[in-house]
Amino acid sequence: GLENRIEYNLVDVVEGNCRLKQAMITDKRCPYLYLLPTAQTRDKSAISPEQMIKLVDEIKADPENYDYILLDCPAGIEQGFQNAIVAADRALVVTTPEVSAIRDADRIVGLLDANGLKDREDLIVNRIRMDMVNRGEMMSIADVNDILQLNVIGAVPDDENIVVATNKGQPLVGDSSMAGQAYMNICHRILGEDVPFLDLNGKGGFFKKLSSLFKGDKKN
């Protein structure tokens, strides 16, 4: 819901057209969260890996204002992907429990390994529908983990509240919905907290067992 407030973007910063803080956008609902938008009308090659590293280092040099830097990586493995991972020290691989998505995620993990992020990757499985899992029509979290062999840090249900929040331009983190709780739990786990997984099955115990199963289970 912040797109109408964009004046400058990431490319403007690296090209020296504005200062970093001029391009940062804040939201009164999340006063400590800053958004640095990318350029929608410029090619991904407008920024080099070296420029991305320099930009991230500039943000890191101000720890009083910035605790974490989240680089939203574009789909695919083109220049935007390379720019994101070159400055990263940890990767959150987000996938859905579909065969094609898992195949793409496995390829991404291989590229992350080759770029120095091996054993610093965590997995978030998105858009889970437990009714389909129970009918054998969708891969379970365990199935996905068997293939990718990463530490599962989040499991997000396929929740219509996500669509509603996106269309309204409203944050879902902290919301009472299942997806909102799942997002908040991911935040806690990134901070190193031991948070049990939500029972997306609604029957108790399923994701609690997964929590102990996946904790520390990383790719060899």
Listing of model-derived features with the role each one plays in the protein:
Residues 51-64, 68-158, 163-164:
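Conserved catalytic-core segment of NTP-binding enzymes
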Residues 4-7, 49, 102, 138, ...:
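Electropositive phosphate-/nucleotide-binding environments in soluble metabolic enzymes
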Residues 1-64, 164-168, 173:
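P-loop/Walker-type NTP enzyme "switch/lid" segment
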Residues 49, 74, 81, 172, ...:
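Conserved phosphate/pyrophosphate-binding and hydrolysis machinery centered on Walker-type P-loop NTPases
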Residues 114-220:
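C-terminal lobe/tail of nucleotide-utilizing enzymes
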